A protein has these predicted regions:
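Conserved, well-ordered alpha-helix/loop/beta-strand core segments that scaffold catalytic motifs
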Residues: 186, 190-219
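Surface-exposed amphipathic alpha-helices with a cationic face
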Residues: 37, 197-205, 330, 354-355
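Catalytic domains of carbohydrate-active enzymes, especially glycoside hydrolases
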Residues: 27-52, 287-288, 438
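Domain-scale activation on soluble regions of proteins
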Residues: 38, 164, 171-172, 474, ...
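Alpha-amylase-like alpha-glycosidases and glucanotransferases acting on alpha-linked glucans and related
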Residues: 4, 12, 18, 56-194, ...
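Mature N-terminal, pre-catalytic/accessory segment of carbohydrate-active enzymes
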Residues: 1-40
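Outer-envelope exported proteins of Gram-negative bacteria
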Residues: 47, 210-212, 216, 290, ...
Length: 502
């Protein structure tokens, strides 16, 4: 079957324009969908929608299933009558339209959402009751987890009192009674998130725009998932990790990356027929049209680092579940659209797993000319892209195209010019030639980060791996979505046979 050529834009929900401190499911999100349609795009790729924790990373969430309350539209709550426009306008979310001030966001949004809950009379809402019943398999544990975390002043669950840390039944019953209204508050937030996200996704689909969601391979240690299902993770009898996730040293990081996530106890998953993973992916496809799985190579082999290590250096490779997991998923769910994030260190067995799965892998232009790459740079040259792949200029973890070109070596810049056969275009405009380069590649799908279409520098970078403090903050300004840019994107998308004519 011939694969339809298509294109899309990568923009996190958090990066949408908004007067309330962070991008959310407000009118600006609907306007962006309309803008995507006018540019001829087929896909809107986003980052994980989970509840963020310390460091604000969407890849370290308190739950694999819960949504981020920061994305709840305050305007929609005003329309419901549980907030007033004056209350929202009075809140101080920070002064910069292109930045997210998470400390202010935590205080101001939290206050407003609690106010909305107090006025909601949610206990008499039949839709809320139905939502709670339908989702109780994850919602009950998550809401209790968040309520107890509040009682213990935000401490990770492995530092809670022993009775609730180990989920002894008397303690579970006690906290459910003691924290009843706090538990209901967290259920209310998930209800509003779910309601608003499904409405936005339905609107996008009605305009011919499909959503590419993103899930991390691992859950966070401090998550409701690890607390509620300790037997599925490599934890000891006291529910403390024995080993954690990361990646080994390479040309980009001399000590590797220590992520700290608990590793899966794959034999326990296998014994259940991979039910937890099947359920997780089923739920993802309730929310998204296509799912990108981060760190796909971890299903072939995963890097195991002894708990307590200061760097990833002492780690070693362990065998993962391989294709068996995805055969079980396909048997349960049928064929689904998954993108395998197969970047980084690649072995022959990882490549074979991607081939066996049939999922498209990822091709990132920036990796094609980088001397720090560990030997597979030619895989990322656009003339080598297979049809069954998704081409990117860069991802949320990369420098923007403009800054990347400025920071690579003279020799690498010469390689770019030679490959483009372009010696005349000024440096500051060369990003357009690079975007056109991957748009005309054979890859069936091509996704361009919004910052690259805008020609922005690293001030608009989403994330710099292995750093904390200044990540996940960039926001798009509404004035940047110009008619001129819209026309330019549409022309290039059409020229290379990727326009969505729906």
């Amino acid at each position: 079957m011939k694969m339809q050529r298509s294109a899309g834009i990568l923009l996190p929900i958090s990066s949408l324009p908004s007067p309330y401190g962070i991008g959310c499911f407000s009118q600006e999100a609907y306007d962006f969908v309309d803008w995507l349609k006018e540019t001829g795009q087929t896909y809107w790729q986003i980052l994980p929608l989970g509840v963020t924790s310390y460091g604000d990373s969407p890849y370290q969430s308190f739950s694999a299933f819960a949504g981020n309350p920061y994305f709840i539209s305050l305007d929609a709550l005003v329309e419901e009558g549980v907030l007033t426009a004056a209350e929202c306008k009075k809140a101080n979310f920070g002064r910069k339209a292109d930045d997210i001030d998470y400390s202010r966001l935590y205080a101001e949004r939290g206050r407003l959402l609690r106010l909305a809950y107090s006025r909601s009379d949610i206990g008499h809402n039949e839709a809320f009751t139905a939502f709670c019943e339908k989702n109780k398999w994850w919602l009950d544990d998550f809401a209790l987890f968040m309520a107890v975390k509040g009682r213990f002043e935000g401490k990770p669950w492995i530092e809670w009192a022993e009775d609730i840390r180990l989920r002894w039944q008397p303690a579970m019953d006690y906290y459910r009674r003691e924290l009843y209204f706090e538990v209901e508050y967290h259920k209310y937030l998930q209800f509003k998130f779910d309601q608003q996200w499904r409405r936005l996704k339905a609107y996008a689909n009605s305009k011919g725009i499909r959503i590419i969601g993103d899930i991390p391979i691992y859950v966070a240690l401090d998550s409701a998932d690890a607390w509620a299902n300790p037997g599925l993770f490599q934890l000891d009898k006291d529910n403390i990790p024995t080993a954690v996730a990361g990646v080994p040293p390479d040309g980009f990081s001399p000590t590797g990356q220590l992520w700290g996530n608990p590793l899966y106890r794959w034999e326990a998953h296998r014994a259940t027929g991979y039910q937890w993973w099947i359920t997780r992916l089923w739920y993802c496809f309730e929310l998204y049209d296509v799912v990108r799985i981060d760190h796909f190579r971890g299903f072939d082999e995963y890097f195991s680092i002894p708990y307590g290590s200061e760097t990833a250096a002492p780690g070693h490779w362990e065998k993962g579940p391989g294709i068996e997991l995805f055969r079980a998923v396909e048997q349960a769910l049928g064929k689904r659209e998954i993108i395998a994030e197969d970047l980084g260190y690649m072995s022959d067995t990882v490549r074979q797993l991607v081939r066996d799965s049939g999922f498209p892998g990822m091709k990132v232009l920036e990796f094609a000319f980088d001397s720090r790459d560990t030997g597979s740079a030619s895989d990322y040259l656009p003339h080598n892209y297979p049809v069954n792949s998704v081409a990117y200029t860069g991802t949320h973890d990369n420098e923007t195209l403009v800054s990347w070109y400025q920071t690579i070596s003279d020799a690498e810049r010469a390689m770019v010019r030679d490959y483009l056969y372009d010696y005349a275009t000024p440096d500051e405009q060369l990003y357009k030639s690079m975007i056109a380069l991957i748009l005309r590649s054979a890859a069936a799908r091509c996704i361009i980060p919004m910052q690259d279409w805008l020609g922005l520098d690293n001030a608009a970078r989403i994330n710099k791996p292995s750093t904390v403090g200044q990540n996940w903050r960039w926001r798009l300004k509404k004035t940047q979505l110009t008619k001129k840019l819209q026309k330019e994107i549409c022309q290039l998308t059409t020229r290379y046979g990727r326009k969505n004519w729906a």
